[in-house]
Amino acid sequence: EPLCRRQFQQHQHLRACQRYLRRRAQRGGLADEQRGPALRLCCNQLRQVNKPCVCPVLRQAAHQQLYQGQIEGPRQVRRLFRAARNLPNICKIPAVGRCQFTRW
């Protein structure tokens, strides 16, 4: 976990992923977010992370959004974490698939 935390910091706290997750949480639906630049940048950042750290850093990115107070109400929180768990699939990161973490 400390290793993953370090990776999180090295990759600018996955800022692009945080932006993508915030939009997904606030707006729900996929809409154009699936093709947006934030998602592309996010996937690029994610591919640079060691495989065992992919899910832990995504969890950190989701938590960072919570702490920043951008996410309101249980529905947005659920969407935030669902989107975070799905990112390895969306980014087609081999051998990671869907993350298993829950909210905490």
From Swiss-Prot:
A single GO molecular function term of this UniProt record: nutrient reservoir activity
Record keywords: Disulfide bond, Seed storage protein, Storage protein, Taste-modifying protein
Gene3D superfamilies: Plant lipid-transfer and hydrophobic proteins
Coiled-coil spans in chain: none
Ligase keyword on record: no
Cystine pairs: C4-C53, C17-C42, C43-C91, C55-C99
Keyword NAD found: no
Function, in words: Heat stable 2S seed storage protein having sweetness-inducing activity.
Subunit structure: Heterodimer of a small A and a large B chain linked by disulfide bonds.
Family: Belongs to the 2S seed storage albumins family.
The name this protein goes by in its record: Sweet protein mabinlin-3
Source species of the chain: Capparis masaikai (Mabinlang)
Lineage, top ranks: Eukaryota, Viridiplantae, Streptophyta, Embryophyta, Tracheophyta
